[in-house]
Amino acid sequence: MVRKPAKMYRNLAKKAYTRREYMGGVPGSKIVQFDMGNLTEDYPVELSIVVDETCQIRHTALEAARIGINRQLQKEVGRANFHLKIRTFPHHVLRENKQATGAGADRVSEGMRLAFGKAVGTAARVEKGQKVFSVWTSPQYVDKAKVSLKRGIYKLPTPARIVEERAPAA
């Protein structure tokens, strides 16, 4: 069965559906890591992707953005000069009422009878102004880190912006 377009799941129409103990089976999350880079160093600059609309972001989109950002940062900044963190977790379970198509589908398909749907994936529910990704780095790498985060924004289903925060000088 083909994957449905992300626009079907983007809006927060109903309350969160997260109680996995009542579900027959939920596909695993594609997100492999939530923290990347140098985790021990404290960096003075934090760059974050902040979403401009309340929406749901599928786990596949989060993973695609993570891969794009991480790969660009490793290539441009170096593995030891940044810390990348995913700030959301895909708790919400997405459901789909599968429809049969083709010849004779009307004999096989149940239509809208028992239309609750089966779990097909997960999504993170984010509010307007919430941070989705954050990168901590040194001041000399800020421009390259912004380019990397811009690459990640293209993979998200909502408008977003990059916010820079600097630690106060001691």
Swiss-Prot record:
UniProt key word Ribosomal protein: yes
Gene3D superfamilies hit by this protein: Ribosomal protein L10e/L16
Keywords, comma-separated and alphabetical: Ribonucleoprotein, Ribosomal protein
Coiled coil: none
Taxonomic superkingdom: Archaea
InterPro entries to which the protein is assigned, alphabetical: Ribosomal_uL16 (IPR047873), Ribosomal_uL16_arc (IPR022981), Ribosomal_uL16_CS_euk_arc (IPR018255), Ribosomal_uL16_dom (IPR016180), Ribosomal_uL16_euk_arch (IPR001197), Ribosomal_uL16_sf (IPR036920)
GO CC aspect terms: ribonucleoprotein complex; ribosome
BP-aspect Gene Ontology terms: translation
Pfam families per UniProt: Ribosomal_L16
Gene Ontology MF: a single term: structural constituent of ribosome
NCBIfam families: PRK04199.1-3, PRK04199.1-4, uL16_euk_arch
HAMAP family in the record: Ribosomal_uL16_arch
UniProt similarity note: Belongs to the universal ribosomal protein uL16 family.
PANTHER family associated with the record: 60S RIBOSOMAL PROTEIN L10
Protein name (database record): Large ribosomal subunit protein uL16
Gene: rpl10e
